Amino acid sequence: MFFTMTTPHTIAIDGPAASGKSTLGKLLADHFGYIYFDTGVLYRALTYVALEQAVDLADAAALAKLAQTSNFEVLPPTIADGRQYTVLANGEDITWPLRAANVERNVSQVAAQSAVREALRDIQRQIGKAGHVVMAGRDIGAVILPDAQLKIYLDASVEERAQRRAQELNARGRSISYREVLDDLTRRDAKDAANTFLAADAITITTDGRSPEEVFQAILGLIGVEAQA
């Protein structure tokens, strides 16, 4: 793959849960002065609202209608409490509740509904069309932003991802074991497989044993080398 510019205007990052997409996305967005948008928060937000309103998570039509009638906003951080962004659902700040155990357990089921994905894709594409954005998800490079100038696919073993996620959750005050997280990620991988796509022109990076900074520097190096080729 060769780029015609050193700085891509649109960056797509895909990969399985806890592979480092959010961390890398934020680093790249900060470096280039771009917006960072994690599309997973939309599915989490919809899952949260559906659970709050006791909507049947197996009812694709009801979920799609809820997605269309709800007002979801992803904003820059409004509170300095470690968040990377603020998520509002119908005006309510739900940023941290999105990481609750019940949302974690059910988001893959919600995201697997094709009607739901279609209902939320327009929001994602509109954000991407504006440019100067780093967007992370499962199908960004292949489906949402197929014309993105830089496409990255992050991968890591489920064991590595479980270790990272367990450390992250425990650091936030949620007591959870590595085994619990490993089992949850294994289930999520199975559910997410049908909606996780590797774009043909994506750069694949395996992040096992590599720090976020090492992955970030590797991406910058690849951009520089290919831009000059």
Swiss-Prot record:
Under catalytic activity, the entry for this protein gives: CMP + ATP = CDP + ADP; dCMP + ATP = dCDP + ADP
Please give the InterPro entries that the UniProt record associates with this protein. Cytidylate_kin (IPR003136), Cytidylate_kinase_dom (IPR011994), P-loop_NTPase (IPR027417)
Signal peptide bounds: none
Keywords for the protein's UniProt record, in alphabetical order: ATP-binding, Cytoplasm, Kinase, Nucleotide-binding, Transferase
Enzyme Commission numbers on file: 2.7.4.25
Localization of this protein = Cytoplasm
MF annotations from Gene Ontology: ATP binding; CMP kinase activity; dCMP kinase activity
GO BP annotations of the record are: pyrimidine nucleotide metabolic process
Q: Which residues bind ATP?
A: G15, P16, A17, A18, S19, G20, K21, S22, T23
Single GO cellular component term: cytoplasm
User: What family classification does the UniProt entry report for this protein?
Assistant: Belongs to the cytidylate kinase family. Type 1 subfamily.
Q: What protein name is recorded for this chain?
A: Cytidylate kinase
Write down the species. Herpetosiphon aurantiacus (strain ATCC 23779 / DSM 785 / 114-95)
